[in-house]
């Protein structure tokens, strides 16, 4: 007992010393190299993903698409993300984070090239599905790669800094759009977007593995991933069939092949049942935690993506700005989100993850309505408001990976994070279509504003009250985790450490 008490005291003393030192002095050149590679991968991921939003009106005009069909091209990438997160995440858990990152970059680069070559709507829709597979894999593998390599007390910063790369990639894409598209047309933008594949070869040759993953491998224990549980054990044939059903249902929901609300509702419920079944099989008695985490991510996408997906269209059509002005404001939004990601990382390590999340979202709520009240002549004021809203309303979402990671052990972290996050990201697939439906009854600006404002409050409740831990304790308290596996902070309802008990 005395020995364990000494360890706890020493840990607390070390934590106090760490907080007094400048944070970046705790990082080695190797850890910075790992971060730089993962951050660049995220930047390229963000660059490729937002290209369709920038040229959506041009694609819609050339292919003769309806607004719903055009919006489905944004949603298509989300249809496959759940499987990409699961499969590539499991590969990351078993074979290493680096290999998964390389495969992910190759997939979304090839999908981007296919978008530029697409002769029509169907081919572009399929190409966007391939982009979704790669994007999901990049997300899960890069996040776990950096979080597992950085010191425990800096892991909010690790998450926040990393996700900023996605937003900066979007802002960079906006600038490339303003230069390339007026000269060579919208297809040329996608050809530029295939360049990340060169970066994949650098990653394959020059990066080490994450610290936590290497330690886990040294234990020589068999790794039982979610892919093993779902597709290699007794229910494998049923789960393969369920996966096919999920893909088919998602296609019906998001391809625009039907506008029958009842049919779409039935398909959505079938998908929900499949994913809940997978969570139940993969997490056992901890399925309430998995479902609540999925809802957290879903509502994060629902409140944020209508604004991100339709911002270029709103600026071009409703505000009637030139391509150069659209690119400038979209760049400000991207860099606002990136700055917010970094600020969120500092806030998370300072105040705690959940408290930082709530405070940041409340500030963002104060700004969202004024964004849509500004007259079109006040371009810089509009840009400043959008920048501020993205800093506090969108940027704080960079802490979501850290939140989810804390509910999984190392051997299932990448697949768990990848699957939960990317199933929840279907909220991003719903968001553009939901925005288009609401906009059909009102203006696009009103639809974007109302959805963002209302749905943000749902996220405030889910994260602010730690609903994953609460619901877990209501249903299966014996399976509840006491402490975050990433930073050791207590979850809701955790017992205080009692040295005498230990």
Curated annotation (Swiss-Prot):
Q: Which residues cross the membrane?
A: 34-54, 71-91, 105-125, 129-149, 158-178, 179-199, 237-257, 259-279, 291-311, 326-346, 367-387, 391-411, 419-439, 445-465
Q: List the disulfide bonds.
A: none
InterPro entries assigned? MFS (IPR011701), MFS_dom (IPR020846), MFS_trans_sf (IPR036259), SA_transporter (IPR004742), Sugar_transporter_CS (IPR005829)
Question: According to the lineage, what is the superkingdom?
Answer: Bacteria
Q: Name one GO cellular component term.
A: plasma membrane
User: What keywords are annotated for this sequence in UniProt?
Assistant: Cell inner membrane, Cell membrane, Membrane, Sugar transport, Transmembrane, Transmembrane helix, Transport
Give the matching Gene3D superfamilies. MFS general substrate transporter like domains
Gene Ontology MF terms in the entry: carboxylic acid transmembrane transporter activity; sialic acid:proton symporter activity
Pfam (any one): MFS_1
Q: Where in the cell is it found?
A: Cell inner membrane
For this protein, the record's CDD domains field holds:
MFS_SV2_like
Reaction catalysed by this enzyme = N-acetylneuraminate(in) + H(+)(in) = N-acetylneuraminate(out) + H(+)(out)
* Family membership: Belongs to the major facilitator superfamily. Sialate:H(+) symporter (SHS) (TC 2.A.1.12) family.
Q: What function does this protein fulfil?
A: Catalyzes the proton-dependent transport of sialic acid.
Q: What is this protein called?
A: Sialic acid transporter NanT 2
From what organism does this protein derive?
Answer: Escherichia coli O6:H1 (strain CFT073 / ATCC 700928 / UPEC)
């Amino acid at each position: 007992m005395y020995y364990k008490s000494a360890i706890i005291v020493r840990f607390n003393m070390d934590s106090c010393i760490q907080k007094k030192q400048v944070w970046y002095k705790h990082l080695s050149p190797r850890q910075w190299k790992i971060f730089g590679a993962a951050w660049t991968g995220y930047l390229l991921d963000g660059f490729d993903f937002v290209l369709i939003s920038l040229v959506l009106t041009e694609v819609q005009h050339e292919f003769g698409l309806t607004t719903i069909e055009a919006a489905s091209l944004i949603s298509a990438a989300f249809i496959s993300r759940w499987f990409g997160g699961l499969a590539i995440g499991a590969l990351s858990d078993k074979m290493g984070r680096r290999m998964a990152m390389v495969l992910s970059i190759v997939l979304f680069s090839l999908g981007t090239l296919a978008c530029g070559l697409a002769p029509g709507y169907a081919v572009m829709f399929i190409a966007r599905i391939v982009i979704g597979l790669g994007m999901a894999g990049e997300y899960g593998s890069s996040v776990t790669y950096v979080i597992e390599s950085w010191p425990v007390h800096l892991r909010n910063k690790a998450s926040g800094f990393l996700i900023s790369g996605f937003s900066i990639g979007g802002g960079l894409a906006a600038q490339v759009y303003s230069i390339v598209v007026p000269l060579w047309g919208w297809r040329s933008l996608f050809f530029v977007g295939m360049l990340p594949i060169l970066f994949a070869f650098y990653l394959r040759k020059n990066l080490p593995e994450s610290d936590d993953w290497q330690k886990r491998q040294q234990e020589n224990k068999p790794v039982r991933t979610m892919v093993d549980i779902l597709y290699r054990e007794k229910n494998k044939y049923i789960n393969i069939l369920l996966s096919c059903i999920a893909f088919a249902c998602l296609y019906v929901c998001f391809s625009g092949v039907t506008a029958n609300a009842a049919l779409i509702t039935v398909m959505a419920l079938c998908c929900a049942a499949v994913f809940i079944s997978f969570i139940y099989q993969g997490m056992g008695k901890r399925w309430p935690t998995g479902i609540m985490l999925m809802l957290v991510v879903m509502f994060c996408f629902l409140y944020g993506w209508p604004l991100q997906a339709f911002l270029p269209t709103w600026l071009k059509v409703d505000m009637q700005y030139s391509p150069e002005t659209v690119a400038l404001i979209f760049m400000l939004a991207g860099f606002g989100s990136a700055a917010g990601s970094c600020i969120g990382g500092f806030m998370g390590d300072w105040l705690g993850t959940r408290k930082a999340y709530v405070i940041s979202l409340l500030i963002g709520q104060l700004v969202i309505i004024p964004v849509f009240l500004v007259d079109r002549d006040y371009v810089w004021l509009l840009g400043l408001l959008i920048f501020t809203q993205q800093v506090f309303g969108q940027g704080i979402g960079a802490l979501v990976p850290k939140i989810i990671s804390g509910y999984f052990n190392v051997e299932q972290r990448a697949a768990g994070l990848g699957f939960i996050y990317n199933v929840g990201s279907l909220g991003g697939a719903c968001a553009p279509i939901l925005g288009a439906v609401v906009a059909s009854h009102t203006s696009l600006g009103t639809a974007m504003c109302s959805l963002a404002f209302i749905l943000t409050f749902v996220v405030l409740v889910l994260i602010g009250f730690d609903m994953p831990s609460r619901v877990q304790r209501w249903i299966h308290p014996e399976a509840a985790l006491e402490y975050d596996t990433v930073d050791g902070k207590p979850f809701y309802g955790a017992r205080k450490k009692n040295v005498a008990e230990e």
